[in-house]
A protein has these predicted regions:
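Mg2+/Mn2+-dependent nuclease catalytic core
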Residues: 57-154
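Conserved pre-motif I regulatory segment
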Residues: 173-220
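A substrate-engagement module of RecA-like helicase motors
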Residues: 178, 185, 243-359, 367, ...
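Signature of the SF2 helicase/ATPase Hel1-core->accessory helical subdomain module
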Residues: 231, 237, 258, 339-358, ...
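A contiguous, basic/glycine-rich beta-loop/short-helix subdomain that forms a polymer-engagement track
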Residues: 334-359, 369-376, 505-622, 630-632, ...
Length: 827
């Protein structure tokens, strides 16, 4: 029987944790601040103190061999020559309330480390010391207990005997899973064209010899070939051969998680003996069963019955779920179990993930530095990563590592706090003053168009360039200064220092006045401050600082321009990663921005008959900003020609809502007989579903939808058959010119001379190709893609077209388009 690998912390917390979920303010960032304090205490101990000592030992309980491992915070020998295991804990509990028996898990961890180290070193006795560091007062309290090795071994053995039934369940499951997955057959009678090739690439990546940073694979495969099954099936087969312990299926949006769930359901339906557990992790806000009056989760034992006593009941819930035989733990299943056992569905999903084989969730569970799954990714593991819609990852990753803070947050906090003097009020005023001076400095360096620095300043004082009234705050040298926006390569320390100084009094106030009316507003401020300070600690040459003055406000953004080192570090936590999409062109761009320059990249050709796709371009139309007004009527005429060629459903994609509205107003005025539907901004899930429902099969009347490229209908939408028979794409999708995009352009110009491509052309064309991919979804589909912009005829754009677009026809005018469409539908 293979040994059961068991981390010390997992063993102790699983068996001994009790009580409730309590997310009330605790005054510090446990993960980051706690680690910093650990290092501080370890350094202060002097010579002879070994920090972060890895320990591992073999034990047996109930016939099960265990490998127990973990890192002891510290080990040293005291003046009496006794070996001491030091367990360090940071806490917000007041020093007077810190008790020796405050948390049994803390002693248990130290005692297990003592058992491992004692046997390893042949010791007869040793001490366990609990070191508590009170984060508000810097008080250090220490408690010491004396043990014989025999006592520690007995304690560890008792824990293992309690854990043995769970280990036995999991070992039996893994054996059953291995047999099942190694014999797993493809769930369809035959592979679609392209599926076998894609599956083979993924299987080879997952079964390749492990490397320090993991194997990386980029797969571009046409829309409609069945990418989800083509990557899931080989990855599961790899787990069946012993290559990979868990599979993480990571998505850009909740709507694509269902594709993974459906693929796994198909595998289960095709093999009744399939042993596979899958869990879908959904954001807490969406699954909360007991939100507060404002609709937010209230994770406090006195407010939420699902939080109260959670740890006393969760193991019972886990046992029931693991024994029920279904193995499918989606959002609905977790909600049902949460109600049955009165446990939080969000936390239940996280705890259940440790017992599941496939974990489906958002990108942020791996890549986000704040919310990633620490239980899996704080150290490397035998994990397989499947990254869906990977073309979305560069922008999502940039957002995850960036942060913003506004002066208005300080103003609102001061207003909420009310009148009176306090340490917090003083700190708020200092920070507010620094941001006020920062706004003056930005307005001086970069007056908004049509204004002066004086008009930007609402303080009642004049601060024109060259005047005697100079801003009292110094900003780093500006790389860009225009229209109220300044970019700097260096951190604006003069703004960050008062925010850092604000942290302690803000923590104190939040802890001392939890019931104050202003608590919610100041708690929001605290998290905003922490977010920008965390980003400042990551800040290096891959970032830029943006300061924007608008009216009385100043916004500070620390922008991650290049997320490659951070994505690389995240992917290195696993054995292998396959990043796939219908649009990863050019591959070198995606490999560079995602930190995988040496990764293998494959591009599969479309399996669909070229004659089923009518592909036309009207290069006589220019959609450049200066020609927008002149383009409206020709675009309307082209859309009318498309929508009138055959009764059916069509989509027209635009680069912006404003442009969309202009054309829609002209179109509906001139072609009122053609039904239209407009994508509104900010649609929720219900609005999205309602929009798509209008695209019904076998329509009796033509419907032309107006949508935005790169939005919720421009990708990730499956309208097969005659639910969609044509789309028009207006423009080449370039992001709007902005200071941020210009900084991206400058950054990559300096890196490789391709700044315009990285900041504008390639992201824009990705949106174009994604939108075009909505039309042909199956072998039987037939439809039209119409490109409206003269730049599609330029080689810099045309070379980005996929191979199956080789039959694209450039037409003179709308009349020729009408004739071509008539011929296409007649075939």
């Amino acid at each position: 029987m293979p040994a059961f690998r068991l981390p010390v912390r997992q063993l102790v917390e699983f068996l001994l944790r009790t009580g409730s979920i309590d997310s009330r303010f605790t005054g510090f960032d446990r993960a980051n601040e706690g680690a910093r304090i650990h290092r501080k205490l370890q350094k202060a101990t002097g010579e002879g103190y070994a920090a972060e000592v890895f320990l591992s030992g073999e034990r047996e309980a109930a016939g099960i061999p265990f490998t127990i491992e973990g890192r002891a915070d510290g080990i040293f020998t005291d003046e009496a020559g006794v070996t001491v295991i030091d367990e360090i804990k940071t806490t917000a509990v007041p020093a007077d309330d810190i008790a020796e028996d405050m948390n049994p898990c803390h002693w248990a961890q130290g005692m297990v480390y003592g058992a491992l180290y004692g046997r390893q070193q042949g010791l007869e006795k040793l001490d366990v010391r609990l070191t508590y560091y009170q984060i508000d007062t810097d008080d250090i309290l220490r408690f010491v207990r004396h043990f014989t090795l025999e006592e520690l071994e007995a304690f560890l053995q008792d824990l293992l005997e309690q854990y043995a039934p769970w280990a036995q369940r999991q070992l039996a499951w893994k054996e059953q899973r291995g047999v099942s997955l190694s014999a797993l057959d493809f769930p369809f009678p035959a592979y679609r064209p392209g599926q076998r090739a894609l599956a083979g690439e993924v299987y080879r990546a997952c079964t390749a010899a492990p490397s320090k940073s993991g194997v990386r694979l980029f797969c571009q495969a046409p829309t409609g070939i069945g990418k989800t099954m083509s990557v899931l099936f080989p990855a599961l087969r790899a787990i069946g051969t012993g290559c990979g312990e868990k599979l993480f299926y990571l998505t850009a949006r909740n709507t694509t998680q269902s594709a993974a769930e459906d693929a796994i359901a198909r595998l289960r339906a095709s093999d009744s003996k399939l042993a596979l557990r899958s869990v879908t992790l959904t954001a807490k806000e969406k699954v909360c069963l007991h939100p507060d009056a404002e609709g937010h989760p209230a994770c406090l034992p006195e407010l939420c019955p699902y939080a109260n006593g959670y740890y006393d009941r969760v193991n019972t819930a886990l046992k029931a779920l693991l024994d029920d035989g279904t193995g499918r733990f989606d959002r609905a299943a977790l909600a049902d179990a949460a109600k049955q056992f009165t446990v939080c569905p969000f936390e239940l999903g996280l705890d259940l993930s440790e017992w599941c084989d496939v974990i489906i969730g958002d990108y942020n569970y791996l890549f986000d530095p704040v919310v990633h799954l620490r239980r899996f990714f704080d150290s490397a593991g035998d994990w397989l990563f499947l990254v869906d819609e990977a073309h979305n990852l560069p922008e999502r990753a940039r957002a995850m590592y960036s942060a913003r803070f506004c002066k208005s947050s300080l103003t609102e906090a001061k207003r909420a706090l009310g009148r009176g003097k306090s340490t917090l009020k003083t700190a708020l005023s200092k920070a507010d003053k620094a941001f006020l001076e920062g706004r003056k400095a930005v307005s001086t360096l970069a007056p908004r168009r049509g204004s002066t620095a004086a008009e930007e300043d609402d303080s009642g004082q004049t601060s024109l360039p060259g005047s005697a009234e100079t801003p009292a705050i110094g900003l780093p040298a500006a790389d860009y200064a225009q229209d109220g926006t300044v970019f700097c390569k260096e951190l604006p320390s003069a703004l960050l220092a008062p925010l850092r100084a604000l942290t302690a009094p803000l923590q104190d106030w939040l802890e001392e006045d939890p019931d104050a009316e202003a608590h919610a507003a100041l708690l929001d401020l605290y998290f905003e401050v922490q977010d920008i300070l965390r980003a400042s600690e990551r800040y290096d040459e891959h970032f830029a600082a943006q300061l924007t003055a608008r009216g009385s406000d100043l916004e500070l953004q620390l922008l991650c321009l290049d997320p490659s080192p951070f994505v690389d570090a995240s992917l290195s936590a696993g054995r292998a990663a396959a990043l796939f999409s219908a649009t990863l062109t050019p591959p070198g761009y995606y490999r560079t921005v995602l930190g995988c320059p040496e990764a293998r990249a494959v591009a599969l050709e479309s399996p669909f008959p070229a004659e089923n796709l009518g592909l036309y371009c009207l290069p006589s139309i220019s959609t450049r900003y200066r020609q927008r007004d002149a383009s409206i009527r020709p675009i309307s005429d082209a859309l009318a020609a498309l929508a009138s060629s055959r009764v059916g459903n069509y989509l027209a994609f635009f680069p912006s809502y404003a442009y969309l509205r202009q054309v829609w107003e002209d179109f509906t005025a001139r072609y009122p007989d053609i039904g239209t539907l407009v994508q509104e901004s900010g649609l929720d899930d219900a609005g999205r579903a309602a929009f798509l429902e209008r695209f019904s099969p076998c329509p009796e009347k033509t419907l032309l939808g107006f949508g935005v490229m790169g939005g919720i209908f421009g990708e990730g939408v499956d309208l097969a058959g005659d639910r969609l028979i044509g789309c028009a794409i207006v423009g080449v999708g370039l992001p709007q010119v902005s200071p941020r995009q210009e900084m991206l352009r400058r950054y990559y110009d300096a890196q490789n001379g391709a700044g315009f491509d990285y900041a504008y052309r390639w992201p824009g064309m990705n949106k174009v190709l994604q939108a075009a991919g909505r039309v042909i979804r199956t072998q039987e589909d037939k439809g039209v893609v119409l490109l409206l912009d003269d730049r599609f005829a330029q080689s810099e754009y045309a070379r980005l077209f996929p191979k199956h677009w080789s039959h694209l026809e450039y037409l003179r005018d709308t009349e020729e388009l009408k004739k071509k469409l008539e011929d296409f539908w007649a075939e």
